[in-house]
């Protein structure tokens, strides 16, 4: 049987260290969101989200509190965070079944998961200049146009 370290691809935690987690696999897709809601939630210009199956995430230290907030779809989302420092760890967007949206920069090795796209550039702060060569969208993307075949299959299974 494989040890926990052999089954762990990524580790993450909150700022105070009270919450820790692991991921078994790469996310389905990672993007930088520039919508005004994400700007407000993070008090920053954008957030980097990694979409993955809930089964990929294991909370191995602490507990998470939750708050419910609005989302661009209007369906809302549940934000899971450290109850002490308040760091957001992930969100569960209503209607995405067995998927969660990890706040990528909570990973210890977040540099290994750069965004594969930028979304909601119609609300990007004007002073932010993007110099990367990844796909950019004024709103959101169609998965079929940007996801790999493997990612599309994983999404299909998770949405069942």
Predicted regions and their residues:
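A short Gly-Trp-Pro
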Residues: 2-13, 18-160
